[in-house]
């Protein structure tokens, strides 16, 4: 190696990408955008920072170079449907605040077309159907998340206009 040793290589890097092997209902999801799912998760604190987002937060490398870990992180994120439904309920509420801040909310495009397009893109074009029943459920419920996010943004905006509570 140009750095002389594995330790020297690590010193030259400011971050490491980790591929995630995502499992849904016990099945490794290999398609639909869920593999290799690289995340910058090991980095020097002065070389990267997390983006200021409530949902789907990612670290961004500010300086230096990042390597990639050889092995993937096994990520058993949603062992049951209840776990995933709880997740999409939480994340759709957080996402609603983000899209509401941008002035987006209820429209046929956001409530129907975006979720449908999300499902078609991930399930068919990105081959999510190759992940069997688990792939179908994952991509179907992800589309539901998109719909809920915009419906909840509308609900938040409606409550603000009326001066009432939306919870």
Predicted regions and their residues:
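Catalytic-site signature of metal-activated, phosphate-bearing donor transferases
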Residues: 1-4, 8-160
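Short polybasic linear motifs
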Residues: 161-167
């Amino acid at each position: 190696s140009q750095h002389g040793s594995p330790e020297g290589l690590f010193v030259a890097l400011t971050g490491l990408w980790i591929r995630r092997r995502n499992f849904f209902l016990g099945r490794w999801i290999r398609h639909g955008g869920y593999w290799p799912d690289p995340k910058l998760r090991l980095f020097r604190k002065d070389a990267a920072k997390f983006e200021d987002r409530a949902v789907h937060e990612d670290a961004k490398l500010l300086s230096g170079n990042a390597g990639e870990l050889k092995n993937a992180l096994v990520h058993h994120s949603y062992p049951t449907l209840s776990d995933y439904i709880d997740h999409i309920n939480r994340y759709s509420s957080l996402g609603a605040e983000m899209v509401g801040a941008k002035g987006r909310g209820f429209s046929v495009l956001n409530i129907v077309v975006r979720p449908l397009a999300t499902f078609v893109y991930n399930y068919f074009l990105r081959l999510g159907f190759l992940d069997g029943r688990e792939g179908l459920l994952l991509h179907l419920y992800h589309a539901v998340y998109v719909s809920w996010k915009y419906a909840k943004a509308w609900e938040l905006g409606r409550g603000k206009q009326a001066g009432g509570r939306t919870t």
